Amino acid sequence: MANLLGLEVKKIVETTPEEIEKVQNWINSEEYKEQNFARQALVINPAHACQPLGAQLAAHGFEGTLPFVHGSQGCASYYRSTLNRHFREPAPAVSDAMTEDGAVFGGQNNLHEGLENAVALYKPKMIAVFTSCMPEVIGDDLTAFIKNARSKGHVPKDMPVPFANTPSFNGTHIHGYDSMLLSILQNLTEGKQVEGRCTGKLNLIAGCDFNTADYREYKRIMKEFGVPLTVLADISDSFDSPCNGTYSIYAGGTPLEDASDSINGKATMTLGPYATPKTFGWIKDNYAGKHVSLPMPMGIEKTDAMIMKVAELFCKEVPQSLKDERGRAVDAMTDAQQYMHGKKFAVYGDPDYLVGYVSFLLEMGAHPYQIVCSRGSKKLEKELQGLLDGSMYGKGCKIYMNKDLWHLRSLIMTDPVDAMIGDSHGKFAARDAGIPLFRFGFPVFDRVNMHRYPRIGYQGVIYMVTQICNKFLDSKDETCEDRFFELMR
């Protein structure tokens, strides 16, 4: 970079303030943005994590389930620490600690010994196995390894041991979540479908959602409806259990019996279609009842769609309590719309979150001006463009598929916005641009208790409106001249 500006490459302690300022000004320029967007072989700070992280999240969503990493200990520590830092809760998982000999001779012995130790020490009801890079590169055969482990008595013959291939060098955390969830459901429901039997329940798949409050909100809404519910991969208690003097490795999770019987449910609804395409495709071919795929219910319109579909599936009237809740959400939007109207936002994150952010912002009269997804698809781009085209506030907004947070920095420095929505990794770009960052995504490392507030449903609307508008008002109070510092806003 220094060479491109005609500067001598020096140690930072030898660099003058003038030279530093020259580089800073250049990386904020249109010229640099063009070069930044021209790069192809390099990714800088992508807005996603790796497959095994999502696989571990899915495993935590089931009762008595021990996540088991077939791979190196260091990889397992990364997945655990990332979840721990986001939720500020333990994220128990084990690893068979493959090293150099496993890389040469294969990891079967590591897996067998690890499974035997896990059963003896942690006494799980189910072990969910997923892989890191090393066993994927050498081609370890998990089907054969686990079959051999059963035949040799390393794990009880009746203990479910679903597994997923989750190479870190391909896909993202949402793909790992999808693969692990699919494997768990295939394993638990095998041979459990009964002709003519119907549990009368709604099976709900929330997608790769890292907000525990969202799961509780789904359960509360269905309780208002009087609809019996099975949440497939329920992390609400796994990562938000009470501090009451006791600790369990296996707090919460969907009961295995309920998950096994979910194949006989009345209907199955996925609210994270971009996070669970393989799982939902298999469910449509194998599960009884009706199958519905809807966007994550962020904002009024998407929440309405979920509410009306549940009412249709179960032939129920929408409860008055939910109608009142909707009215309060609309009232909150009306009270606050003048503080968001016309504001420009840069948004980034997982596909399902992006659809939700964009829908919500358009409803508030704001502009989702720059939309960045690090692993997007043509289908996602088409859906987002449809949302933009359907609103006057989408005019001039642009979608950037398969771009990273360094691309996003160039965008907000050359074409400024009023705020960003995403996760903690965007704080550096937000600081450089001098704008607020609203941490509604994953991971959130630098704020506390964010996962305890819903983003979905009518309550989610009220929460996001409140957070965003009050921050704008705070900023106005902090930066205005004394003569404009008023009691009323």
Where are these regions (language model features)?
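An N-terminal assembly and electron-transfer interface module characteristic of large anaerobic redox
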Residues: 1-489
